[in-house]
Regions:
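Generic structural signal of hydrophobic/aromatic residues within well-ordered alpha-helices
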Residues: 90-98, 112, 180, 209, ...
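Peripheral terminal appendages
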Residues: 1-31, 35, 39-40, 152, ...
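Residues at alpha-helix boundaries and short interhelical turns
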Residues: 62, 170, 213-217
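ATP-dependent adenylation/nucleotidyltransferase module used to activate substrates
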Residues: 1-143
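Catalytic subdomain that performs nucleotidyl-dependent activation
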Residues: 76, 109-117, 131-202
């Protein structure tokens, strides 16, 4: 297990360095009420008093009220300012406009909300001189479980090297509210959605594999496939050069 006292100090120093080098006046991040947002919010607030978490409902059918409550509970405990921007009408308008141009797929529709949230965070960041903090962890990044140019877009990410297992350990060390530690991880993209059901592997299996542990051949095959088909999300943009 990591020394989370040391990890806390190093990551807070990292965030302060990012702000100092960029000349930013503050930080903004998406507060979904999940574990990653909770940890990022706590770290950012410790590094910068002017930290804002934004809750962005976007016609999500999953229990938004519970997620919003969990996000506020973390924010209240650690003194993080919370704002709400309802993107539901924006998404509905976008879908209506798209109907005239293409026949959408469930996956394409699911990725609209994360990209609208990214746009919202960068609008706030641009208007107020903030930097956008990313909330993706190492487990999600390895299998590409994030939306390209959506929740994967940010100016800095203080938890990108932590697996889901380590995120939970870190939150327990910080005495974060149990509500974000005990519920099943979910991107809340559709009714009943959970990360593990959608991926077909548990985070325990994924984290063990990333750490070099042994897992069943079928789970290894699934993880390898997810990593392979999502490689385009992790590499720089292909740019033409002579």
């Amino acid at each position: 297990m990591r020394d989370y006292k040391e990890e806390f100090e190093k990551r807070v120093a990292f965030i302060k360095s990012v702000l100092q080098k960029s000349g930013a006046k503050g930080i903004v991040f998406g507060n979904s009420g999940g574990k990653d947002c909770a940890l990022v919010g706590i770290l950012c607030k410790a590094a910068c008093e002017n930290t804002v978490g934004v809750q962005m409902p976007c016609s999500t059918k999953r229990n938004y009220d519970v997620d919003a409550k969990d996000g506020r509970e973390v924010a209240d405990k650690f003194g993080i300012e919370t704002r709400v921007v309802d993107l539901t009408p924006v998404k509905e308008a976008a879908l209506k406009a798209l109907e005239a141009a293409t026949e959408t797929t469930p996956a394409a529709v699911a990725n609209i909300a994360p990209r609208l949230r990214m746009t919202t965070l960068y609008a706030i960041a641009g208007a107020e001189g903030r930097r956008v903090a990313g909330t993706g962890n190492a487990s999600e990044i390895y299998v590409g479980y994030f939306t390209k140019w959506g929740d994967g877009a940010c100016d800095f990410n203080p938890i990108s090297d932590l697996t889901v297992t380590e995120v939970y350990e870190f939150l327990r060390y910080l005495d974060a509210p149990k509500c974000v530690i005990e519920k099943a991880p979910s991107a809340a993209l559709f009714e009943g959605q959970t990360d593990e059901n959608e991926m077909g592997v548990t985070y325990a299996e994924l984290d063990s594999y990333i750490a070099g542990g042994e897992i069943s051949p079928d789970k290894k095959e699934k993880i390898d496939r997810l990593h392979r088909i999502s490689e385009h999300k992790r590499v720089p943009i292909a740019r033409y050069a002579e």
